[in-house]
């Protein structure tokens, strides 16, 4: 009998695994690794202007009220897709400070000319230095920064229409 | 049009899989020694199916080669500006294409088995083909219902959207297909094991049929893992050669099971022992292949290897896994008790050593499996953990160290029963080498424990691996024995590389101004300059490093930080300087505010031996296959000649002589 029971052991182990894996498949997967920087103050930075039309960006510019920090680039296709949503946020009275990654002034101006300019300031990050310092690995990404300069929320990827209320709520929470 | 031909071929192949399954099952209804009339369709069904599945894959290959942007798969994974070679490799660099490749290889090996294997009893063969058809059917269903590679777009896309740049590499051309072919070889082993279990024909003849498939799969897995390790080493730019990443583990686990299976099959073929154990490992090896596919494709685990994942497809694969593996283990539990026990043997014997090492391999497999699935388990309770080298290295070493020692001694033992006293010289030599090398190395400095043990074991194993050749005429040693000797020696070589990398690597991370020099080991590395460069679909900054060994002539290394567009992603291209005794590994990082560049350089002594060892191990496997097959062919020819002579003598009316054995 002992030997017979041993023969069932692989099946029992497998059933346990299958049950666990099945359960995990039904769980909503948190697709993004949250930045360690959530709850941390912004690192100190001062970036030069990305083109002639707007001033550059620095940490001090986030003082006063909650703002959005949008990391983007003129060469990034999803950034075109998210441009209307940024315009919508701006229309709701949200101040958006941009950081353009590895970009050229002429391209930035061209992009803003074609797809609209929702930004109050744009800093030029030619070597992704600030981008990496705030825990972002791609474009576009958007951060909610409160009045004290603390990172409160991170949105990875382009902002879809359905993401706008969530961002507004996070800005509200950051008051 | 070609896409429609491919799709039609797939549907037809699926229909033939049903025929193969049903017809094969009828073979079981035949009385022993007879053939059921309905069972005769299984073999042709498998052969035609192989042609159809290969045709479907060829059609997809054509669509990628010509960048047919009306296909959804091509539009979302390729790009007209990609070099042709990467267009072709892009065929299987995505979910649907890789599953089609899997199915194609599966059908091809089913066809080969059905077409050429005549040694098994028809009942076992029928049952095997039925199982093979059943397995294939599940994957056809998966392809056709949940991941159709031939789906057309309503409107052709103007341009494709690229390929993961990390995977845009010649390594990708070889690595996944090799692993897949290995996995599929294990599926044939699985079908054969189930066939033999259903007919209770688990015997040496069955083992001889099983062996080439297991060996072949094992060689391919060995090569696949070796190539994958080297790919991760130079492409990820982190300086490591094994990260215990879920995707890497997914390829390691079937290899461990296949290694155990291969040795177990040899015992069954030579000594008619370990019957149940062989069947069990046959099921286990394929389970691990499917589990690997599930883990990689479902996205339940996070990995550095970015695959497109989809929980629904994960559910489908999990369903297949439950059906095949759950079913197989159920049949195993019900049937294995009825398989007659094999021959017995003493604890100290060749079989004893093989069983011990099979248990050790299984234990390592359990360690890796647990470590890989543990994050899944804790995540069920909302705890995110990452299991890494601090767990895997010591936990697997606990079992790997005794295994390597027994591996040194095992091939020297006799079958059935042996006395340790007979091997006094060999045992003393092995012990002296282990202790001597460890003492010698410790004398020169403080090194971590595991690499130190690894060096001692590598030296002992390298010598012990050659001992089976001692006192024999090298010309008369069978090819298969050469295979074993070379494979075991290859393990020693790889172990030596791993231990050296662990013990003696030097690392230097420095911020350098252009023109500045850093010293690492014997090498002086000068940053001559940093320039932007552009490729077909990327731009990069490239550092020009002049490397001088002991003040000699400079060698130029050009590590790059690349930025791809479509999709935008940045990668780090390492630059390697290979010497006979190691590699210099250089990566360029960010530029600091003051204009200095981060340069990261490693000197890794003998690191290349890891992969040389892997290639030797695979070569040993190939020799073993060649040896076994040539013996089989000679035996078959001799039998045929004997039959011919007897027939001739019969025709002449003379009395047939008794054939000499």
Indicate residue ranges for each PLM-predicted region:
Chain A
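Thiol/disulfide oxidoreductase modules built on the thioredoxin-like
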Residues: 113-118, 125-175
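N-terminal targeting signals for export/organelle localization
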Residues: 1-48, 175
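Structural microenvironment flanking redox-active thiols in thiol-disulfide oxidoreductases
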Residues: 80-116, 126-132
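Hydrophobic beta-strand anchors of alpha/beta hydrolase catalytic cores
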Residues: 68-69, 96
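Short gly/ser/thr-rich secondary-structure transition/capping motifs
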Residues: 27-28, 48-55, 122-125
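Aromatic-flanked redox-active Cys/Sec active sites in thiol-based oxidoreductases
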Residues: 70-75
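A short beta-strand-turn-helix
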Residues: 45-67
């Amino acid at each position: 009998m002992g030997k017979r029971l041993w023969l069932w052991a692989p099946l029992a182990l497998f059933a346990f695994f299958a049950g666990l894996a099945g359960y995990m498949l039904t769980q909503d997967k948190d697709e993004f690794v949250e930045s360690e920087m959530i709850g941390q103050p912004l690192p100190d930075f001062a970036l030069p202007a990305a083109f002639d039309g707007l001033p550059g960006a620095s940490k001090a510019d986030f003082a006063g009220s909650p703002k959005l920090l949008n990391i983007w680039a003129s060469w990034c296709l999803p950034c075109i897709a998210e441009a209307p949503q940024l315009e919508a946020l701006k229309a709701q009275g949200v101040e958006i400070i941009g950081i353009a990654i590895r970009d050229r002034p002429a391209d930035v101006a061209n992009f803003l000319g074609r797809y609209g300019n929702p930004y109050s300031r744009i800093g030029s990050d030619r070597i992704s230095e600030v981008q990496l310092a705030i825990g972002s690995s791609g474009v576009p990404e958007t951060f909610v920064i409160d009045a004290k300069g603390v990172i409160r929320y991170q949105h990875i990827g382009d902002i879809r229409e359905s993401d706008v209320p969530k961002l507004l709520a996070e800005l509200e929470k950051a008051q | 049009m070609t896409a429609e031909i491919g799709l039609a071929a797939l549907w037809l192949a699926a229909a033939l899989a049903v025929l193969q399954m049903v017809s094969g099952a009828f073979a079981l209804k035949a009385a022993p020694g007879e053939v059921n009339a309905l069972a005769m369709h299984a073999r042709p069904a498998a052969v035609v199916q192989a042609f159809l599945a290969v045709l479907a894959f060829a059609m997809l290959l054509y669509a990628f080669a010509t960048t047919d942007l009306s296909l959804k798969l091509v539009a979302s994974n390729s790009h007209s500006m990609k070099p042709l070679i990467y267009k072709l490799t892009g065929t299987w660099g995505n979910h649907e294409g890789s599953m089609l490749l899997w199915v194609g290889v599966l059908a091809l090996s089913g066809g080969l088995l059905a077409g050429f294997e005549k040694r098994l009893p028809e009942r076992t063969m029928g049952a095997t083909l039925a199982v093979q058809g059943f397995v294939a059917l599940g994957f056809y269903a998966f392809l056709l219902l949940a991941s159709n590679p031939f789906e057309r777009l309503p409107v052709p896309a103007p341009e494709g959207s690229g390929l993961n740049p990390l995977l845009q590499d010649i390594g990708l051309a070889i690595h996944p297909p090799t692993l897949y072919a290995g996995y599929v070889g294990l599926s044939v082993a699985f079908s054969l094991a189930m066939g033999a279990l259903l007919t209770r024909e688990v015997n040496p003849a069955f083992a001889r049929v099983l062996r080439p498939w297991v060996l072949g799969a094992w060689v391919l897995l060995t090569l696949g893992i070796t190539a994958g390790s080297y790919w991760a080493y130079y492409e990820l730019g982190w300086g490591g050669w094994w990260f215990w990443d879920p995707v890497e583990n997914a390829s390691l686990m079937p290899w461990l099971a296949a290694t155990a299976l291969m040795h177990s099959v040899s015992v069954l073929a030579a000594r008619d022992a370990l019957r149940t154990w062989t069947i069990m490992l046959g099921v286990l090896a394929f389970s691990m292949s499917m589990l690997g596919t599930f883990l990689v494709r479902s996205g339940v685990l996070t990995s550095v290897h970015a695959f497109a994942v989809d929980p629904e497809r994960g559910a489908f694969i999990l369903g297949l896994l439950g059906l095949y593996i759950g079913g197989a283990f159920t049949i195993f539990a019900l049937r294995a008790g009825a398989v007659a026990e094999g021959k017995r043997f003493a604890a100290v014997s060749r079989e004893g050593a093989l069983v011990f090492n099979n248990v050790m391999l299984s234990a390592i497999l359990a360690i890796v499996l647990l470590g890989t699935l543990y994050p899944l388990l804790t995540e069920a309770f909302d705890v995110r953990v990452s299991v890494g080298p601090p767990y895997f290295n010591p936990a697997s070493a606990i079992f790997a160290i005794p295994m390597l020692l027994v591996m040194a001694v095992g091939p020297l033992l006799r079958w059935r029963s042996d006395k340790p006293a007979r091997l006094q010289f060999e045992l003393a030599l092995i012990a002296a080498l282990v202790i001597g090398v460890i003492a010698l190395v410790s004398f020169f400095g403080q090194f971590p424990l595991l690499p130190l043990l690894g060096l001692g074991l590598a030296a002992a194993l390298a010598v012990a691996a050659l001992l089976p050749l001692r006192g024999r005429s090298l010309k008369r040693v069978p090819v298969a024995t050469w295979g074993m000797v070379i494979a075991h020696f290859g393990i020693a070589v790889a172990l030596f590389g791993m231990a050296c990398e662990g013990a003696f690597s030097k690392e230097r991370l420095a911020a350098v101004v252009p023109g500045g020099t850093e010293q690492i080991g014997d090498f002086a590395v000068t940053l001559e300059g940093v320039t932007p460069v552009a490729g077909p679909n990327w731009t990069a900054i490239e550092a020009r490093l002049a490397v001088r060994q002991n003040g000699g002539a400079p060698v130029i290394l050009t590590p790059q930080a690349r930025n791809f567009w479509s999709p935008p992603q940045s990668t780090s291209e390492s630059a390697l300087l290979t010497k006979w005794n190691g590699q210099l590994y250089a990566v360029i990082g960010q530029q600091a505010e003051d204009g200095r560049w981060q340069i990261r350089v490693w000197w890794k002594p003998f690191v290349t031996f890891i992969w040389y060892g892997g290639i030797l191990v695979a070569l040993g496997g190939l020799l073993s296959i060649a040896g076994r097959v040539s013996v089989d062919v000679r035996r078959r020819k001799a039998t045929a000649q004997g039959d011919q002579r007897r027939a001739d003598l019969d025709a002449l009316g003379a009395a047939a002589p008794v054939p000499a054995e």
